[in-house]
Amino acid sequence: MDDEETAEIEDVNVLVPATGGEGPVDGASAMGAVQETENVNEESEAQREEDVVRDYMMELIRQSDEQLAADAPDAAASTGSDGSGDDDEQPNQNEEVGAGSGEQEDEAASHDSDMSLDSPGSEDDSVVWNPHPPGWMIPPNRLHSAVDMMVTQARNSDAGIAGLLSRHHFLQRIRSIVFSQERRRSRTSEEGEASSEPPHTPPPPRSPYDVEMEEGIRFDTNLAAEHSYFGNNSSRVPGVDYLEEGSTHHMLIFLHQHILFPGEVLPFMIDGSLIDEEMQQNGLDGLIFAVGFPLMQPPEDCPNRLYGVTCQIYEKGESGRQLVFYKSRALQRIVINCDDIQGLPQYIARNPTNKCYSKVKILPEYFLPEPLKCIDMGSMSRFRDIPSMRNMYQRYQITSTPWPLDACLEYSYTDIVEKARKKLEIHKIDTMPKCPIQLSFWLVRNLHLTEKLMRSTFLTDSVNTRLQIIGSTLKDESVFYCRYCNSSLAYCSDLFAMSKHGVQTQYCNSAGYIHETNTVYRVMTHAIGYSGEPTTEFSWFPGYQWHIILCKFCAQHVGWEFKAVQPNLTPKLFFGLAGSSVRIGKLVENTPVNGSTFVVRNLLRMVSSEME
């Protein structure tokens, strides 16, 4: 810290009167005070430094509160604006994870936050607010408590209290402490507080984004689905084998940081000798291997289980880095007994070097047809498919069953499929499968359930139950939140398909790291910042350049901005949100977008400007 900043902090200390002061002192008293100061011990000096930092931060909080009082009406009425004028600010980021980054990706892969499915701030945190003050206000006593906690922790650290005066460390500590306090408040809030809130008028509907209004050539979604960014020197590998449900098999296993559902494509780079040797030993063209999800919590009665999917390789290519690029497709759900694992399983995204085997059991998929379709009405069955006779035919069917019509329709998946089809029309997706089993997995990937519901749908063996869970979420309006600081980033209604596989796709970067990416037309105002320079190198979408985007509040990597570089290519601009950096939560109608951290934003902005 330079002399000007140090002088600033000492000046702020003057703003807070010392306890016990009686007024001005004469020269003799001042000389005595100076002499006394020179003789203080090390403990008193450390206490003085603590007081300087604490007083400085308290003064910033006071100024932030005054600014809040002036801006409160505007903040309560706004949605998505944080009152910031620093649109061009580019937050510093020590760990940047980009679509084409190399060493940064390897470092990012080692962090639990990139792989957590149960990180601080669950899927319901966004709907828990204190009903008494406005939802965007954080009480000053919590900010004061955060300051005290930060100073106490710094005092016990090796750097001591002086470590707080480093600009980057200072800002990071404020973020960390305030975020932890906010998450603790969300987890410990009583459930009754949320239920006692009076009903609120829902916000006006947002205007949908229609890419058809853009003039130009529509991007070919087959290019992204084929993962053409690895080149055109790949060859098809024959064979798609489904294993018998309930059977047990011995196979090669890897780990993965995301949940895969059957039907998803998993691209990856790996040492080719691991796969080629396995193919030669088994005499298989399209090798089947297992992928486990260690961060998906098993049921409480079976804690020693690892759930995953079988994957089969269907295409092979060369990456040019002594690694081989493979494309595989998830086929069936599996369960692994951890006691049967032979060797140390490794993550498939981290260039595994060792083989690991285990027995895996293929999980069943139970599907019950709709009750009314199981009733044979004899010669009257010919009227079933006549639209004008359908209602009358249904009434005749009901008379032959002991169940009322509502009970039969409750387990009808046709209505769920039709509602889902209408909701997905805005995403421009026309690849909905017809098989109920494949359809249930496809809807999970494209309707974007919360992580808790995703685990529930994966663990259930009943296709009907899976569709019922999906149907219960069709009316909810959801938002992408930053996994690190809980700031809202984008509306799920702005999702669209840049791949023929849907709105959520797995992509592999040049370093071998696999990203689960959600493509959206737009993000919220003032939600993101940028890091690095845009580039077209190794772009997942040919004809587009990518640029790393960071959460504007916590400066963590949350995805990429893609901008068309070829003329007349549409959409001209869109965003890819990294699944490891975002979570899905319900939209809170009575809370301004990004408003829960309004006070903290003002504080951090003021701290940053004061320390520039």
Curated annotation (Swiss-Prot):
Record key words, sorted? Metal-binding, Nucleus, Ubl conjugation, Ubl conjugation pathway, Zinc
Q: Which domain of life is it from?
A: Eukaryota
Q: Where does Zn(2+) bind?
A: C482, C485, C551, C554
List the molecular function annotations (GO) for this entry: metal ion binding
- The UniProt annotation puts the region (Disordered) at 1-30, 58-133, 181-211
What gene name is listed for this protein? ohgt
List this protein's GO terms for biological process: protein ubiquitination
According to UniProt, the name of this protein is: Protein cereblon
Subunit field text: Likely a component of a DCX (DDB1-CUL4-X-box) protein ligase complex. May interact with pic/DDB1.
Listed Basic and acidic residues bias regions: 181-190
Q: Name one GO cellular component term.
A: nucleus
Q: Which organism is it from?
A: Drosophila willistoni
Question: What happens to this protein after translation, modification-wise?
Answer: Ubiquitinated.
